[in-house]
Amino acid sequence: MNRIRTATLALLTAAVLAVSGCTTGADDLGTLVSAPAETATPAPTATAAPPTTDCTPSATTSYAPTGVTDSATLTEIRDRGSLRVGVSADTLLMSARNPLTGTIEGFDIDIAREIARAILGSPDAITFVVITSAQRLPALTGGEGAPPVDLVARTLTMTCDRWSTIAFSSEYYGAGLKLLVSESSDAAGIQDLEAAGDQQVCAPRATTTLSRLENEYPGVEAVAADTHTQCLALFQEGSVDAIAGDDTILAGFVAQDPYAKVIGEPLSSEPYGLGMAADDIDFVRFVNGALESIRADGRWQSIYDRWLGELGEAAPPAPVYGR
């Protein structure tokens, strides 16, 4: 392993461990060095089920806002005085803890704060609950081992399979699945990794990324980790050859590791939606109304420019309604 890269990882780890946060949940940042290597395992490719590709309406189709101002969930939130949102704490640019202030910040966070503003009148009327990728759906369905939340804003791709369990807002960001490799790598895309053979590619458990690796790219060995941060640690110590992830996530990794680069054209489109419980459609309609306002008055653009502007010019995705 590159000695300079080792030093970079050590410095990042030290900065992380120096911070104590006030949010609830299992902070992903704490797993950067404390999680044993055994938590990353080859994915069970033989038993993985391919994602559903045929669904009507489409995965990006949500419920149209109708001007509704109340629902069971909205009443609970207002009585509580705070919107509980499931987030990441280690996805730089999207949702990560600032090592200097201890606060969680990023694109997803600012979008969630605007939803809190719409419900409670203040973007600060919000509680961030740190969850892993695998806890995103259980946190909305009452699944075992996941803290309950009203909303998930954690780079959650809208899929037909997930619609069978939860509900989504309209699409609020369109990401693309890419690969991160060492700066010295000659690979230009995943086909080069497949051709090289014996290449390990890391992705978090319970993600569309891991499923895609297992089912569409048998020429690489998919390695499952609990979090994106664990994938980064495995990559930096030389245990895996690449990380697969959304371009937003990988851009944050490159900002942390100058000895890494993102390669290739997007392997897929990853539309992000805010996750909500499936049994309160009026809450979904309300959130979609809030997103309409965020798009229309320029707040979405300001949030994008602040956090993701280096990825290039972008406009908010057009909402699709019809459920």
Regions found by a protein language model. Give the residues of each.
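Extended ligand-binding regions for polar small-molecule ligands
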Residues: A40-V68, T207, L274-L311
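Bilobed "Venus flytrap"/periplasmic-binding protein-like clamshell domains
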Residues: I104-I119, L156-T159, G174-L232, A242, ...
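Extracytoplasmic small-molecule ligand-binding "clamshell" domains
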Residues: L32-L151
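Bacterial signal peptide processing site
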Residues: T23-A26
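Acidic, polar ligand-binding/catalytic clefts
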Residues: R113, R117, D124-L193
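Alpha-to-beta junction loops
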Residues: D124, G142-L156, Q199-Q200, E237-D246, ...
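Periplasmic-binding protein-like
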Residues: Y173-V181, D247, A251-A290, E310-R323
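C-terminal motif of bacterial Sec signal peptides marking the signal peptidase cleavage site
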Residues: V16-G21
